């Protein structure tokens, strides 16, 4: 995924005049809130180090909803975003850098008991199954096109962290997630041994 650090680094004198507000979506271990509500994580450390070196004050706000993050960005609430996935229509109000600071490996997750039952060679193999997707996430052209096809059974929710819980509860059958995000949640919520991944596919833009 990509962030908007490049623009700010080009304008250090202007930026030093006020506090920068940086928005992001909760995505442990990259960005999360500790028990006191303070932002933590690899992305947080990155921007804190960069702007600390520039003597630029920052405030980081982490949300659980990608749709809310996008609305706030479009409305001018934030000066920068942390790791907001690319969509062409967002270029009307966001400046994306040409280089991504991190790349994710995405897989389709299933319940461990269903691993031998759910076959996945092409996306069409998933038509019989309920697929969880997250509102306002940027998916590949193939997956985005499938979401408009009534032959598929997509379920859209606003909060990505609910996807694995829905999967465990049997409310969906398959969900595309990044390995970093999914494994962090699996470890945090004690879901080891309950979920597995299908063969790797480029399911989502990162």
List PLM regions with ranges.
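Positively charged n-region of N-terminal signal peptides that target proteins for export
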Residues: 1-4
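N-terminal signal peptide c-region/cleavage motif recognized by signal peptidases
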Residues: 12-17
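Short glycine-rich His-centered loop
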Residues: 18-42
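Periplasmic-binding protein-like
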Residues: 24-26, 103-107, 191-206
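Ligand-binding cleft/hinge of the Venus flytrap
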Residues: 47-56, 99, 123-127, 135-158, ...
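Acidic, polar ligand-binding/catalytic clefts
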Residues: 48, 61-125, 139, 200-202
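Alpha-to-beta junction loops
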Residues: 56-57, 74-83, 129, 168-177
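Short helix-initiation/N-cap motifs at beta->coil->alpha
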Residues: 59-71, 154-169
